[in-house]
Amino acid sequence: IGSAGCGPTAMAIEISTLTGETVTPKMTADYSIEHGEYVSGQGTSHSFPANAARHWGLSVKRVGKNRMSEVVQSLKQGKLVVVICAPNTISGSSGHYIVLTGVDAQGYITIADPGSRSRTGKVYSVDTIQSYGRNLEDGAFWIIGK
C-alpha cells in the first residue's frame, strides 16, 4: 500500500466517511487485487473508484474537468469526490488519487491526500483542483454519495 496505495486509501476514506463503517485501505486494496483493479507497477485502475463505491453500496458519477460546478455542488450536498491527478501536479511524476472533502465559505475546496498528511485539510481553489485532474475522456472526478 505504501508505494501504490493512494487509490485504495482514497476509497477507504470515502467509504468509511459515507457509510459509517470501518473500511481500511487493506480492505479496499484486497478488493482491487481480487477484482483485477490493481495494475502492477502502476497502481489501481481508473475503473476502481466506481467499482469499489458500488461494491460498498454507494452511488457514483464520473465527470470531467469541464464539470467543476457539478463537483462543487456535490461537495456542498455532502458528497465526496475522488480525483485522479495528473503527474507532476500535486505529487511526483506519476498519477495520484486524492479526495475532495468539502467547500469552505470562500469557495475553496478542502482535500484529504492519502500520500501527505501535510496536504490533508488544506484548501485549494477550484481552478487549481481542475488543473490537477487528468485529461481523461471519461473524466478524472468521481462524485460519490450515499
Where in this protein do the model-derived segments appear?
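Catalytic nucleophile-His microenvironment captured as a short glycine-rich beta-strand/loop
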Residues: 6, 80-118
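Loop/turn elements at helix/coil->beta-strand transitions in domains of secreted/extracellular proteins
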Residues: 55-61, 77-81, 105-108, 137-138
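Short amphipathic alpha-helix with an adjacent loop that forms part of the alpha/beta core around
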Residues: 72-76
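Cysteine-nucleophile protease catalytic domains, especially the papain-like/related folds used
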Residues: 1-62
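Conserved beta-strand termini and adjacent loop/short-helix elements that scaffold enzyme active sites
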Residues: 63-65, 114
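Noncatalytic regulatory segments and standalone regulatory/sensor domains
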Residues: 103-146
